[in-house]
């Protein structure tokens, strides 16, 4: 998974940093995590196939990265810190 090239909209990157405190630059590093897990997201794949990646970033944060692929490039759609809630 580490040979994927990424492209993103800078406005969306700023919005994601404001909303989730995660930049797409950091989110991209999750794809270098050999233990990352990728899931197909059928609930959000009406117009294009979308995926959810769970992995560790270079800052050692566990991130959830929602993304798709267009013209053989990855496009992050949203990224945030994974939060486990204890009951």
Residue ranges and their predicted role:
Residues 1-87:
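Ribonuclease/tRNase effector modules and their secretory precursors
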């Amino acid at each position: 998974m580490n040979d994927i090239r990424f492209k993103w909209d800078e406005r969306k990157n700023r919005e994601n940093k404001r909303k989730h405190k995660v930049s797409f630059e950091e989110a991209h590093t999750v794809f270098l995590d050999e233990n990352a897990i990728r899931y197909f997201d059928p609930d959000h794949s009406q117009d294009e196939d979308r995926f959810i990646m769970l992995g560790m970033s270079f800052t050692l944060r566990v991130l959830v990265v929602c993304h798709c692929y267009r013209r053989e490039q990855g496009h992050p759609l949203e990224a945030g810190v994974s939060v486990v809630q204890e009951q």
